[in-house]
Amino acid sequence: MNFAIEYTSAYFSHLAITPRKKVLKHSLVSVQSGLVLIKLGKQEYAVEPGQSVWIPYDCLTSLTYFPNTQVNRVDFSVRLTDSFPRQAGYITQTNLSSALLEKLEQTKARASKANNTEQAFKDMLSVLKQEVLSFKPLLCESALSQRFNQWNIDDSNLPQEHTLVMVMREAKKRMQSGQKRSLVIDDLFSGKEEEFEQLCMLVFGEDL
C-alpha cells in the first residue's frame, strides 16, 4: 500500500547505485553514517554523516550509497497538495525535525510489537511535513564534493577507501555500457582478475 508520507531506515552494507532518472516523489534523505553521493546535472554532491538533502519530485538524479552507510529517508507523495521546496539541495534540520526523525526511528523499531504506535507514527510524520515545507535547500560544493568531481582514474586526491569505491563504480559503469569484462580488468586493474574479483566481493558483495 502506498502511503502519502513514508519513513524508511536503510543500511547499505555494500556499494549501491540507483539508476539516473526522474524521481516520482519528494524525498528527505538524512545520512547517519557512511557517505552518499547525489548526482545533479554534471556535478556530484557528497552527503556526510549529520547532513541531509532534499530531492524534489521530477528531479533527475542518481544516488550512490557507499558501503556501510546508514540513512533515514522520508518520502512525500505527489498526491499531497502542499507547496514543497522545488529545488534540490542540502537542508539544515530544525531542532524539531531532528528530534522527529530520531523518534521515528525509535518508534519504527517498536512498531512490530505494538499496534498503538501506528497513529503516533502518522502524527509525527504530519508534523515533520510542516517542518519540511519551511526548508530552503541550497546547493554548494563542499571540499569533499569538489574532490569527487575532480576525481579521475589516473589522479585521485581522495582517501584510499573512497578511491577504491570510485574505481569499482567506474568498472561497473563501463561493463554496463557494454565494455568487455577482460578489457575493464586490463585497464583498471592491470589485468589482475583475481584482485578484481576479490574487490567485487568486498565492495559489491557479488561478482560483476
What name fits each language-model region?
Residues 1-35:
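Generic protein-terminus/edge-of-domain signal
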Residues 27, 33-39, 52-53, 61:
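Short beta-strand segments in beta-sandwich/barrel cores
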Residues 32-33, 48-49, 67:
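A cytosolic small-molecule/anion-sensing beta-strand core signal
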Residues 41-57:
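Short acidic-glycine-tyrosine-enriched beta hairpin
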Residues 59-90:
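Ligand-binding loop in jelly-roll beta-barrel domains
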Residues 93-153:
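An amphipathic alpha-helical interaction segment
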Residues 148-154, 172-208:
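Basic/polar phosphate-binding segments, predominantly the helix-turn-helix DNA-binding elements
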Residues 151-167:
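Short, Lys/Arg-enriched anionic-surface-contact patches
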